[in-house]
Amino acid sequence: CKSCDNSADGGSSSSNGDSNLSGTTGQLTAEGSSAQQKAMSVFSAKYSQAVPGAQFSYNSTGSGAGQKQFIAGQVNFGGSDSPLDDSQMAEAKDKTCKSDVWQLPMVIGPVAVAYKLDGVDSVALSPEVIAKIFKGEIKKWNDDAIKKLNDGVNLPDKDIKVIYRSDESGTSDNFQKFLKTSAPGQWDSEGKAFPSTTGSGANGSSGVVQEVGATDGAITYVEAGFAKEAKLKEAAIDFGQGPVELNKETVGNALDKLTYK
């Protein structure tokens, strides 16, 4: 999707369909998902190599902000972990040169339930337990519901400190969809704004991992790359048939079943 102004212009196309971008100049601007920030950094470097006369900038302000800026015509494209709905698509079309708006799946980023708990290397949690933690019904790491899923693990009598995204976030949207689907009856909230009834908010993916990394007993949800970079532990998820770790194999298995609407 492309807005009217502030775009990189120039260049030509050859008869075989390949683009000759050597003469392209200008600024390509984008804004949105902080979970996509690392991928966008790679895209930016590749774009600069392919189009040395143009500049590409990405502002990782969160999916909600990226959608709003794109719809308002302030950026050339928005990065979002949640798609635009029909009304947003219509509004964006009206404000972007009357052209159709394209939504292109470009980045896959698994969401981890990341935590810091000194002395505990691995924890398994069920979707129901995760939902109860994030709405404040389970408050201690040695709660019976957690102990039941972690036989033989010495869980401390320590407060659980929930850290959530304070900005409008596609990661929040997807995490809440997961809870609502996988823990029916335990989670009612939805959307890019996470309920602020329990815990403390932090801005962006970098913000939540920074808070968790500095707080023993803390837990959050975040794109797995940020959790790994911050050296946070990632909970295995138990859907009733044993804990499933987040790794390349399990992510690959999930992607094999992925469908696009």
Predicted regions and their residues:
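General small-molecule cofactor/ligand-binding pocket signal
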Residues: 57-59, 163, 200, 235
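N-terminal segment of the mature folded domain
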Residues: 6-147, 209-211, 222-230
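Extracytoplasmic ligand-binding site segments that recognize negatively charged/polar headgroups
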Residues: 110-114, 120-210
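Ligand-binding pocket segment of bilobal, Venus flytrap-like solute-binding proteins
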Residues: 67, 168-260
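N-terminal Sec signal peptide cleavage junction
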Residues: 1-4
